[in-house]
From Swiss-Prot:
Enzyme class: hydrolase
Domain of life (superkingdom): Bacteria
Protein name (record): Probable endonuclease 4
Function: Endonuclease IV plays a role in DNA repair. It cleaves phosphodiester bonds at apurinic or apyrimidinic (AP) sites, generating a 3'-hydroxyl group and a 5'-terminal sugar phosphate.
Names of the cofactor(s): Zn(2+)
Pfam families hit by this protein: AP_endonuc_2 (PF01261)
Binding residues annotated for Zn(2+) 2, in chain numbering: 145, 179, 216, 261
InterPro entries linked to this entry: AP_endonuc_2 (IPR001719), AP_endonuc_F2_Zn_BS (IPR018246), Xyl_isomerase-like_sf (IPR036237), Xyl_isomerase-like_TIM-brl (IPR013022)
Upper taxonomic lineage: Bacteria, Pseudomonadati, Chlorobiota, Chlorobiia, Chlorobiales
Amino acid sequence: MRYIGAHVSIAGGIENAPLRAQEIGATAFALFTKNQRQWKAPALTAKTIEAFRENCERCGYRPEHILPHDSYLINLGSPDAQKLDRSRNAFIDEMQRTEALGLVRLNLHPGSHLRESSEEACLETIAESVNLAHEATNTAVAVLENTAGQGSNLGHTFEQLAFIIQRVHDKSRVGVCLDTCHLFAAGYDLRTEEAVNGMFELFDASIGLHYLKGMHLNDAKPELDSRRDRHESIGKGKIGLDGFAAIIRHPASAEIPLILETPQPEIWSEEITLLRSFEEAQNC
């Protein structure tokens, strides 16, 4: 079975996220655990935590199919010592919030060197940031999201992601979330079944499919290898429906959250139905 959903709003309280996911027919979902535009947020109350857990259980969402995302402000590879410390503290707080909610994974953008340090130094810093977060928490898995390679953001190649993972001490608490738009922007073709199969084979050889903990399903506005992060609705961009059908049918996409971050929330339910139809067609 494929667990397909979207990154839903937490407006009115984080406990509303599973209800919004249910409204669009999702079997998985992503969310922020706080306002992602702010460094600090009030601690989660016992009442909020209980309501969130109850709504997840009532709506049938298991922890492994929920993928919280950390704040975009965080840069775990920052070359600035003060900003790095602030980012690390914020990330630890988000890992702790993830655990408090009873969830098991936290999606993060690896980091950026801001053209002030070498790529290798930045990747080393990111790995050490993850290690420090592990030391300060108990169970949450840090899930590295591949990037589009825009600007000085790292994590756009499988080699860079593997470099980080190799330096994380607790391998059981690190993984990868593959964003299809980012993959395409970074030069990984996804337009055909052959291309998709090749991408997963390369990922397995470079990193290992057992590290794949989730995917973001987004079509891409720009052409292949554009290094531009511009999401498009499923089937409306340069990847196209054949690519997404191949992803849904590939064994690697089973049992992990498959999350839409496409630009039209009003058609998420339609996109979920479309993606699910690819799996149903395979089972016929």
